[in-house]
């Protein structure tokens, strides 16, 4: 009777260890996608204030502002907040320039979400197969241990 108890305890520990080893491998796969998406979002957010700085600089000097427009954003670092408010009326003149940086931001986010959805859908299938394998192996091992412990 004591041998059966020891065998049962060892079997339980073995299966618990196998499940514990399988569970952490699924968690890190889910974590990088959300981590990658916020990393991309602030980068795009940093680019977005630069674009509104270009639009207001071009609005007052619309005819001869091609070269100064490029130099103005570099010179006007702390002023983008004021320029951003002023860019609303002149947004129609530079709409393609301002619209371009926000467009890649949603694309990058959706691209990050797309691959994360794919592996997430595959992970439960792999987990279900792994669980089924553990169930079959555990049942066979239990029957074998009890059979040989008598």
UniProtKB/Swiss-Prot annotation:
Tissue: Expressed in the anthers.
Function description: Proteoglycan that seems to be implicated in diverse developmental roles such as differentiation, cell-cell recognition, embryogenesis and programmed cell death. Plays an important role during the formation of the nexine layer of the pollen wall.
UniProt name for this protein: Classical arabinogalactan protein 6
Its membrane topology: Lipid-anchor; GPI-anchor
Location of the region described as Disordered in the Swiss-Prot/TrEMBL record: 19-131
Low complexity bias spans: 19-75, 85-98
Residue positions bearing lipid (GPI-anchor amidated serine): 126
Keywords (A to Z) from UniProt: Cell membrane, Glycoprotein, GPI-anchor, Lipoprotein, Membrane, Proteoglycan, Signal
Subcellular locations according to the entry: Cell membrane
Posttranslational modification: O-glycosylated on the hydroxyproline residues.
Record's GO cellular component terms: extracellular matrix; plasma membrane; side of membrane
Induction details: Up-regulated by AHL16/TEK.
Propeptide regions on this chain: 127-150
Cystines in this chain: none
Highest rank taxon of the organism: Eukaryota
Span of the signal peptide: 1-20
């Amino acid at each position: 009777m004591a041998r059966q108890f020891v065998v049962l305890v060892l079997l339980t520990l073995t299966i618990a260890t196998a499940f514990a080893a399988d569970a952490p491998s699924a968690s890190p796969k889910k974590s990088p996608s959300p981590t990658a998406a916020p990393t991309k979002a602030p980068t795009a957010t940093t680019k977005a204030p630069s674009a509104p700085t270009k639009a207001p600089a071009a609005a007052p000097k619309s005819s001869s502002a091609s070269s100064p427009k490029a130099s103005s954003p570099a010179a006007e670092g702390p002023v983008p907040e004021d320029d951003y408010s002023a860019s609303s009326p002149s947004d129609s003149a530079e709409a393609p320039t301002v619209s371009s940086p926000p467009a890649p931001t949603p694309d990058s986010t959706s691209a990050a979400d797309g691959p994360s959805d794919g592996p997430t859908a595959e992970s439960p299938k792999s987990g279900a197969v792994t669980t089924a394998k553990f169930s079959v192996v555990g049942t066979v091992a239990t029957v074998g241990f009890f059979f040989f412990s008598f």
